[in-house]
Amino acid sequence: MSNTLSLIQSNASNPKVWVVIGVTVAGIVILAETRKRRIRALREEDFGAFLDRFELLPFPPPPPPAAKQSLSGLTFSISDAFDVKDYITGFGCPQWKKTHEAAEKTAVVVTTLLKNGATCVGKTIMDELGFGIIGENKHYGTPINPLMPDNVPGGCSSGSAVSVGAELVDFSLGIDTTGGVRVPAAFCGILGFRPSQGTVSSVGVLPNSQSLETVGWFASDPSVLCQVGHALLNLSAVTHRRQRSLIFADDLFELSDIPKQKSVQVVRKAIENLSGYKTPKHVNVGQYVASNVPSLAEFCEQSGKSQNSASTLRALSSVMLAIQRHEFKTNHEEWWQTCKSFLGPRFSNDVVTALKSKNESIKSLYRVKNEMRATIQSLLKEDGILVIPTVADPPPRLNTKRNKSLNEFLDRTYALSCIASMSGCCQVTIPLGEHGDRPISVSLLTYYGGDKFLLDTTLDVYASLQDQAKLASNLAPVSDTNGNMEASEVMKEKGNAAYKGKQWNKAVNFYTEAIKLNGANATYYCNRAAAFLELCCFQQAEQDCTKAMLIDKKNVKAYLRRGTARESLVRYKEAAADFRHALVLEPQNKTAKVAEKRLRKHI
């Protein structure tokens, strides 16, 4: 029996002893609570994003006449998978950290950013050993989602996403294997870029699954996103104007319950007033993949019916996860076998499943992957950009148990993320505001090696996307939104075809049907106005343009067409005002310049 216990027992009836014990216990409780509050305060200060705070200063700028460092004055954070000299890379796992030495060199990508003038301010929390897309870490805590504090931030690069979303840094680095940059970017309402697989150096980055993963980055500002991309990919600053062909993945947007007027229609409207964009196309990605990736049939669920889009993408994502488990086990099984006796049981289910997986059908897995890259290349060619939802669901609540609902969430999320992971193509996540209290995002995906093309497109379309997203947020919901949106777009496309064929009356009829299905689309009114102008129905054209402006005040075409209608009605002063307004919105518009100059003679 200990001396302390003997003393207590022998003086159990002495009230002074109990006072001492009470004070001692109270002191311990107070100290514990003080420590909790201190930890809580530190987490609130940086949203729980950082694991280690330090400062890596940029390299000295080169002497003139060398160009200025492109990232000068910017700060960034890095996930716990990147080596920093004299620091142990923990891989989001204390057991890993205990069994490894400090890095001898800093990761190449980090050094590249320092050479370009940026300052690294610390390492951020990530999902354990790079697994998962939820963003929770049972060892270090879960970073706080700046947009939805009661919900997960997304992973595996959770801390890096939060550090940008909370405006703690200008940009950050993360790892994207099965969605580790794209998903948290969507959940935190920021930009996230996954480059073409293998195009950014992985030297000094701990591998999870090397044939799937790539270094990715986050930013809130599209210009910063592009500057980082130019530095890491060593891209030319010269921009060649190219045509772009957007292809909407209709079946993938059906996975999401976000109204299409806040996703698909936002993208459509954003490119209508931009030059260099072809008429959008549509594709059923699931059917396209099923038809062009024959090796995938081996992994599809057996049924008497033909495979639908959802089952095809589930099969594709299952192949992706099987490759991830196989490569992770190959990379780290030796460490596990050597150290498991003293590592303890606290590993995530994903890690344990990977380490216990059996390597079956490996050749078939990689055959699917190779066919998938060729399939997406064939679909997109050299100017195609696939438009898909980044995620189908809002971020789950914190500490959600692994149940049927969460498994379905994971299935839908992986069905979307596997397209880029399995093809190796580049993908950017772009925020589009909010629906209710949840963030909305859309992803643009282009062919392997088209990183500069995608970065330039992001910079070109971003401002217009944000304008249209704000307009969409103020519109009243359209009943039966998804169905009516699709039908109205079909009518609009028929109207466009009739217009090109100079069948003006048919065009008017088709546009009228589109308006009946969706009266909140400015383009439908504006297009019908163009057809009315060809029919010399100037008053109807004027009315349609006015309606279009009430929906979209920045619709340049509406001002141009109303100006033309008013000029034809000999209302020169009003017509001139419309053309001047068009020039305010688009100063280099030649049609408006010529018309405004012409009308001066009549006023």
UniProtKB/Swiss-Prot annotation:
What SUPFAM superfamilies does its record include?
Amidase signature (AS) enzymes, TPR-like
Q: Does the keyword Transport apply?
A: yes
GO BP annotations of the record are: protein import into mitochondrial matrix; protein targeting to mitochondrion
Q: Name one GO cellular component term.
A: mitochondrial outer membrane
Membrane topology reported for the UniProt record: Single-pass membrane protein
InterPro entries assigned? Amidase_dom (IPR023631), AS_sf (IPR036928), TPR-like_helical_dom_sf (IPR011990), TPR_rpt (IPR019734)
**SMART domains, A to Z:** TPR
Name any one Pfam family assigned in the record.
Answer: Amidase
Indicate where this protein resides in the cell.
Mitochondrion outer membrane
| Residue spans crossing the bilayer | 16-32
Record PTM N-acetylserine, positions in chain: S2
User: Which UniProt keyword terms apply here?
Assistant: Acetylation, Membrane, Mitochondrion, Mitochondrion outer membrane, Protein transport, Repeat, TPR repeat, Transmembrane, Transmembrane helix, Transport
Inactivation phenotype: No visible phenotype.
Annotated TPR repeat ranges: 488-521, 523-555, 556-589
Q: Does the keyword Mitochondrion apply?
A: yes
| Expression sites by tissue | Expressed in roots and flower buds. Detected in leaves.
List the PROSITE patterns. Answer: TPR (PS50005), TPR_REGION (PS50293)
What's this chain's function? Answer: Chaperone receptor mediating Hsp90-dependent protein targeting to mitochondria.
Q: What is the protein's name according to its record?
A: Outer envelope protein 64, mitochondrial
